[in-house]
Amino acid sequence: MKIYELAKEVNPYVVEMRRYFHEHPELSNQEDKTIERIGQELAGMGIEYEVVPHGGIVAILEGKTPGKGKTVLLRADCDALPVQETKENLAGPRVCCSKVDGVMHACGHDG
């Protein structure tokens, strides 16, 4: 399967996850539910993981030749900011908004 076809196949899942995390933000060092959900998703995919205290999670995905291939590190922030989200942005109504009063994912790369 080509990468574009794979991306189309997983797109609904990716959108669902992005919206879930955007609607349920947690402040730094308080990301317990976020880490729990990520752990559930990883476990559902058969991926082993370890929770790191204060809002972290580490998972190792082995390739076809464990220990012999290249290593890739993927890092992502999962904390939110103490900011009230508005229901609209400059383009109009938001597709999804934080359901937590006074907390939102407000980094420049968040949509």
What are these regions (language model features)?
Residues 2-105, 111:
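Acidic/His- and Gly-rich active-site-bordering loop/insert found
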